[in-house]
Structure formats: structure tokens, C-alpha cells
Amino acid sequence: MLRLWRYLCLLLTVWFLCNFGPVYVVRAQNRTGATTHPDEALALNSIFAAWRIRAPREWNISGELCSGAAIDASVLDSNPAYNPLIKCDCSFENSTICRITNIKVYAMEVVGSIPQQLWTLEYLTNLNLGQNVLTGSLPPALGNLTRMRWMTFGINALSGPIPKEIGLLTDLRLLSISSNNFSGSIPDEIGRCTKLQQIYIDSSGLSGGLPVSFANLVELEQAWIADMELTGQIPDFIGDWTKLTTLRILGTGLSGPIPASFSNLTSLTELRLGDISNGNSSLEFIKDMKSLSILVLRNNNLTGTIPSNIGEYSSLRQLDLSFNKLHGTIPASLFNLRQLTHLFLGNNTLNGSLPTQKGQSLSNVDVSYNDLSGSLPSWVSLPNLNLNLVANNFTLEGLDNRVLSGLNCLQKNFPCNRGKGIYSDFSINCGGPEIRSVTEAVFEREDEDLGPASFVVSAGQRWAASSVGLFAGSSNNIYISTSQSQFVNTLDSELFQSARLSASSLRYYGLGLENGGYTVTLQFAEIQILGSTSNTWRGLGRRRFDIYVQGRLVEKDFDVRRTAGDSTVRAVQREYKANVSQNHLEIHLFWAGKGTCCIPIQGAYGPLISAVGATPDFTPTVGNRPPSKGKSMTGTIVGVIVGVGLLSIISGVVIFIIRKRRKRYTDDEEILSMDVKPYTFTYSELKSATQDFDPSNKLGEGGFGPVYKGKLNDGREVAVKLLSVGSRQGKGQFVAEIVAISAVQHRNLVKLYGCCYEGEHRLLVYEYLPNGSLDQALFGEKTLHLDWSTRYEICLGVARGLVYLHEEARLRIVHRDVKASNILLDSKLVPKVSDFGLAKLYDDKKTHISTRVAGTIGYLAPEYAMRGHLTEKTDVYAFGVVALELVSGRPNSDENLEDEKRYLLEWAWNLHEKGREVELIDHQLTEFNMEEGKRMIGIALLCTQTSHALRPPMSRVVAMLSGDVEVSDVTSKPGYLTDWRFDDTTASSISGFPLRNTQASESFTSFVAPRSEISPRNNDARPMLGAQMNEGR
């Protein structure tokens, strides 16, 4: 009996420690009786009450502010799981009193002024109030915080002058006042803060000159001085900041020349110096900066030549010397720098030819608008290369038309149709598909994947576009922005739901225009930065750029949102007069360093435009159509008569053959009858590209058949999907996939290069995406690291692709098999939805389609799995599952986990009910955005609701992910599959609803079930596609 009692006592002790251990330990940390100083406790409670935020239980245990995480040295300020957060020092008055030393209220959408009580917390050493909507001014009482070391007010709406009392904070190491609305000059007193290591005053609103007292800031390691209205020359004393590793001076109004003292800054790894007026400088000052990895010296009136020793800068990854006055030849050693990936030399007067060799890492090259000549080296045809060679004098004879297509029209003086105008207008939907406006004007599509150094020429050589620039600090450069907003002052909202972005310079050209006067119409809508009335820090951004028409500056520091009355739902139209005298028209949008850099994301700046057009101010005399290949009307008539006769004879023969083989080639006929026919490859071409389908080139095996990597004669790497011989289902999918994907073109949909239907051979040829599929990245060997921001962008990209399929494409399409293995990643980790073999064209006038069930277990919506009830909400459900997989880094089902975690959707719901959603986030992520994580989980649960009517359309999903609208509350349990058990060969009994699968995502089991209702007692549905490992890579 005594032994039993001891056993029960032991169990009770273990239970007590498991449940109350953490609290007990925290209280043990305060055994001395140390408590928060009552004045500070009152002040902090007043501050939080004014800001309508609460002190969380992690550091406010039983009402004691300085407890838990607040006194736990292992909890760092940078930990996103703790926000808001305070830290305390409890060593005062014989360890009986705690003083508040740190306050973090970061990106919490706090609105209002800073309460006066904050300035009474004199023991503060670290204050982080960044990314809120704080208003009002900073008072002189700021000088009370003399112990302050790190002070951040960046990205708020603070105004008024900076008080001179800031000079009393002599222990300050970091000062961030960037992206605010301050006024007045930069206080001289900041120069007293001689221990400063980091200073960020970009976009702060301050003006005047850089104070002479800044010469004392010799401990500086990082300095951002950009987007300001400063006066005077760049001061010499910056050359004394010899500990600098990062320096940004962009769009400040400071004039040159660049001081020779800059040559002392040999510790720099990143130098961004741009938009300096007056004064000519050479590149002599960089001669000893051999540690640089990023060197941007854009638009600075630089003269002279590129240093011959540039090949010694072995750490250089990005070099931008564009928009200067450099001359001479390009050193061959520059193109062979091993680390260099981005090179911008455009808009200089460089001559000679391109180097004959190029380093493997160099994938983005801009040499546009120079005096380069000669033949192009062989490397220009390499795949995965962004190359802008516009406006030079290259010899292009013998160049394959598929390589740098249209470049002949964009050489110096724009020679195509020069002297014989054939067009009298053009209209372009920038960044979007072809659109017909309410006035019946056709805006041609311009949704090419223009990268950091790119150009495109339209099929009829009517217009062209050229873009250069790399967004600073952005891990995933995006050059098209999309939105589902409806705009209140136009009947053509669709025209403004996409926009072309550029990080530096964006040009549109009208080619072959009849000479005369034109009205140029530019249309804009700010769809990336929210309105400033949105009560979120994401609405505090400012975009500004310059506009030139025919070389004439027509807008300086143009701000789309401000012009629209600070509205993001109003479109803006601008009209300018231009004269065309040499058959071409140029519209140039140029970023001159102005605007905020990082709101709502890193790299949200530079030109943005929705549509471009030009119409004549005269009566045209040209046909406004591409030139006819015929030489004379007589020849045309004779040709037609002869052609009709021959066609009649041939038609009879063809009809006879077709009728004879109709049953055999029904899929060929479907392809031939398509409006937009895919490019047709010969079987021998694809055999050669894949080295006769060599097993070493095999990427995977799917239900459709094997997939091979290949290389075409033009150098393009492709993925070739080969239809399994004799597969009737495969032939149906072959046609379905061609019909579906040929009807759509989008940045987030895999690109079909063409197909082969020669004899019994059926092959599809896709762009090759080197980073494989999302499931491999998430659940594979983890050779590809996806950080949080990348996962979020992948989620947003997939959502945008589905919006296009459901709502924007000419043919509405339900994919039916959205899953992690059907989302491929390109070299920049941009997601592409692939594998349209199960896609259904969808009539949006119908409420749903009844069809046989096809898809992958684990991603199937309940109404579709149970009743074959198909709508676009079927894809929404599958997207929700993929979103959860992205958040958690695990498949939707895993038999190796404990029961409560085995099924991802069920586990997510249980955590949501307990308010512990954050536990779902992948523990392998060292950093993540808490707000985005909760948002993504909430959206995923909305997308997987049992009733399809409760699931949001994908356009609303994009708006919620983008932060344009709030995430709706999840009010009911999602429709996860609870009792429907499947295996690789049969879908067995259904004993209830909702449903849950038992197969892990990594098995990628797809199945096809009969169209009719599936019987719960006698279900003979069988997986007919089999395992789709690495499908479509």
C-alpha cells in the first residue's frame, strides 16, 4: 500500500511540473521579491492602453510586468514570437526593483501619437517602434533617455522637426528615423552622438545640408541617406567614416564631384551612390575598394573609362555603372568575375565589341544605349540569360531569329520600317493580357517575363519595350504587379489590374509609325502601395519617378497615388503631345532615387505603369496593318485564283484521308482547330535534344509517362513529357493540356514551348525549371532552403496563377490537380503551376460542372470527392492545403507523426481553436513574420471550409495575402477527410463526412473515379494515373 502511495505521489509531481513548471521557474526568478518600479509600471500600462495593445502573458505573469520573457536572457528582442516585448534589469536597490530597459512594439499597426509617459522611462536602452502608424512629433523630452543605445522610429507618420535634445543621447549606437514626415534640417546635435554605428535617415523628410558635425561620426558602419531634399556638395568628411561597410546616397539633391576622400572607404561591401548632379568624377576613388560585393554608381555624371583592374574585384556580385558618361572598351576581365551575377553598363558611350567569354554566374547583362559594334559572341544564345543590347550597332547577320528576337528593330536609329511608316497608333496593356476596352480599343498583351535586363518586340513589330534594373534588398525581384481592385473612375478596371514595374529604367517604343503629331496616353494605378488612409504602415510608402516623351521631361517626381488624390482605387490618365519625325516614338520612365525603398516590401520603388498608347493628331494615310508579303495586286489576284483551284483539289484528297483516319487522329484535329496553335517540334528534334531519351536525362516518371530534360538547338533547356504508348487516358490528357495551357500565359503558369504529334508519338515541350517542384523543396532532402519571405511569395504567386485561370484568362479553367508536386520553381524561386492534364474548361455562367472525380488524395474538396461537383472552389480548397504545407514545411498527411499531428488540416484546425496557430509554423525557420504566418494560416482555413460557398474566390485570397483586405474570421470547421481511407490501389469504404485521407503528400497519388455518385459501401474507384513523382520537372 505504501509503495502504491509513493507511486501516486510521483505521478502527481510529474503532472504538476509539466503543467506549472514554466510558471514556477519564472516565479523562482523573482524569489528576491524584485518588482517593476511602480512609476514605470504605471507609465507602461498607460502607454499600452493608449495604443490599445496588451502586455502578453509571456512577460506579464499575474500582473507583474518584469517577469517571464522580460527577464529571461535567452529571449532575444529579435525573436518574432515575442511582440510586443519589454526587457527588464532587476539589479536595482539590492535586486528588489526592476527597471524597464527595452521596449519593442514592432509592426503592430499602432495608430496615434507617442504618449508622454514614454519619455519618463529613463533606463531605456533599446526602443523599437518601427513599422506602425505613429503620428505627432518627437518632443524635447526625448533627451531624458540618456542611456539609449538603439532607437528606431522608422516607417511611421511622425512629423515636425527633430529636437536638438537628441544630441544628449551620447551613448546612441543606432538611429532610424527613415520613412517619416519630419520637417526642417538635420540637427547639428546628432554629431555629438559619436558612438553611432548605424544611421538611417532616408525618406525622413529632412532637408538642408549634411551638418559639418557629422565629421565626428567616425564609428559609423552603415549609413542610409536617400530620397531627401538636401543641398550642397557631397562633403569630404564622409571619407573619414572608414569603418563603413554599407553606404547609400541616392536621390538626395547633393551635387558632385565625388570627393577623392571616398578612396579611404576600403571596408565597404555595399556602395550605392546615385543621382548626383553637376560635377564630373572618374572611377579613381574605387581603386582600393576590393571588398565590394555591391557597387551601384548609377546616374552620377561619371567620366573616363572602366578601370582595367576591375577583374581584381573578386567579391563583386552586382555592378551598376549605367546612365553615366563612360567611354572606351569593356575589359574582358569584367565579364569573367566569378561572383558577378548582375552587370549594368547601359546609357554610356562605350565602344568596341562584347567580350568573347562570360563567367558562368553572370546571368543579367545590360549594355543598351552605347556605341558597341561587331558580331555577337556565342554566349548570347545561352539559356537563363537576361540580356539587353538595345540601341547599339551590332552586326546581327546569321543570328538565329529565336535568339534575341526583334533586336534588329532596336539597334541604333530603330531601322525597322524606318522611312516608310506603316502604323498610325498602338496600345499596350503593360504587364497583362490582351484587353478590349469599352471603346473597343484593343490593348495588346505585354506580360512577358521581363527581368533585370530585358527587351521585347511585338509580333507585328508595332511596338517594343525595354527594361533594366535590380530592386535593392529584394530576394525575389518581381516586375509585374497585379490586383483585383475595382477602380471607381473608369469603366476599364481590368486594364489597371496589372502593371509593369521596373527598378531603374523602363522604355516603350512605337515602331514604324507614320510621321506626324501624336497624343501619347499613359495610364496608371498604384496597385502595390496601399493608400495612406488605410491605417497600416503598408500605406506609408511613396513612389516617385520621372517621365520622358521623345526625350523631353514631361513629369518630374511623378507620384501616381498623390495624383489620384491619395487613392488606390482611382486610375490616373496623362496625355502628352509628341512629334514623330523618324517613324519611332520613345516613352521613358526613369527612377531618379526618389520615393521610399521598402514599403510594403523591400524593393517597392521605381516606375509603374498600367497602359501605354499613342493616337495620331492627323488623318492617317497608312493601312495600320503589318506589311503584306505580296508585291502587286495583280500577282495577288492570280495567286488567289491558282491557289483556290489547287486548294479545291488538295481539299478533296485531304477530306478523303481525314475521313479515313478520323477515329485515329481526333486529338490531332482538336489541336489543329485551336485558335492559338502551339509550336510543333519534330520527333527527331526532341530525340536529339534528349540524347535519344537517354536515361541519364530522365527527370521522373508520372502517370502520363516519363519526363526528360533536353537542350534544343537554340540552347534552350526544356522538359519533355513523353506520352506512354497505348495510354488512351494519356492521349486525352495530351489534348486537354495543350488546349488549356495554350489558352493561358501568365508569370505563375508553366510555359509550353510546343508539342509533337507525329505518328504515334505524343510529346509536350515545356520550359525547364531548374529548382524542381515545391514538394521536393519542402519535403525532400532540403537541398533548397526556402526562407519565410520566399514561402510567402510562392504562396502569393500560386494564388495569382489561379486567379488568372479562374477569372482573367480568355477561357476560364479549373485546374483540378493543384498540389505541391504540380508547382514548379524557376531559377529565382518564382512558382509556376504546371500539369494541366486534368484541367477543365469552365463556363462561368454555370454554377458547377458534374464530372468524374480526378485529382490527388489529400487535396480534394469534399463536394468534389463525394459527388463530382466541380467549381473553381475545388482549386481553392487544394490551394488551402498547399498553403498549410508551405507554412508548416510538412506534407498534408504523415503516418510517422503522433495521432494529433498526423493530418495537417485537422491539426491546424485544432491549434486554431486553441489560439495556438503559430505552433504550426515550420520549426526549421530561424526567422519568420508572425503577422504573415497567422494571416496565411487563417486564409488556408478559409479556403478549406466544408461548404464551397464559404471559400473565398482566389482574387480575394490574393487581396488578403497582399494585405489589401482583412482576413475574414474562420467560423466553421474545415472539410478535411476524416474517415475515407485510401491506398495505392483502391479507395475503400466511406463511413462518414467530413473526410480525411491517409496518404502522405509525398506519395503524390492521383486517382480518377466515376462521374456518378460514389457508393460508401461499394467503391471501386481505382488510381489510374499512378504515382506522379517529379511530374513535369
Curated annotation (Swiss-Prot):
Residue list for modification Phosphoserine: 821, 850
Keyword Isomerase among record annotations: no
Cellular localisation: Membrane
Binding residues for ATP: 699-707, 721
Pfam families membership: LRR_1 (PF00560), LRR_8 (PF13855), Malectin (PF11721), PK_Tyr_Ser-Thr (PF07714)
Keyword list, A-Z: ATP-binding, Glycoprotein, Kinase, Leucine-rich repeat, Membrane, Nucleotide-binding, Phosphoprotein, Receptor, Repeat, Serine/threonine-protein kinase, Signal, Transferase, Transmembrane, Transmembrane helix
Database matches in InterPro entries: Kinase-like_dom_sf (IPR011009), Leu-rich_rpt (IPR001611), LRR_dom_sf (IPR032675), LRR_Rcpt-Like_S/T_Kinase (IPR051824), Malectin_dom (IPR021720), Prot_kinase_dom (IPR000719), Ser-Thr/Tyr_kinase_cat_dom (IPR001245), Ser/Thr_kinase_AS (IPR008271)
UniProt EC number: 2.7.11.1
Extracellular side: 29-636
Cytoplasmic topological segments: 658-1033
UniProt feature coiled coil, ranges: none
Protein kinase domain residues: 693-951
Reactions performed catalytically: L-seryl-[protein] + ATP = O-phospho-L-seryl-[protein] + ADP + H(+); L-threonyl-[protein] + ATP = O-phospho-L-threonyl-[protein] + ADP + H(+)
Segments for region (Disordered): 1012-1033
Residues bearing PTM Phosphotyrosine: 766, 864
Transmembrane segments: 637-657
Enzyme class, spelled out: transferase
GO-annotated cellular components: plasma membrane
Chief location: membrane
Carbohydrate-modified residues: 30, 60, 94, 144, 181, 264, 280, 301, 347, 351, 393, 579
Name of this protein: Probable LRR receptor-like serine/threonine-protein kinase At1g56140
Naturally occurring in which organism (per UniProt): Arabidopsis thaliana (Mouse-ear cress)
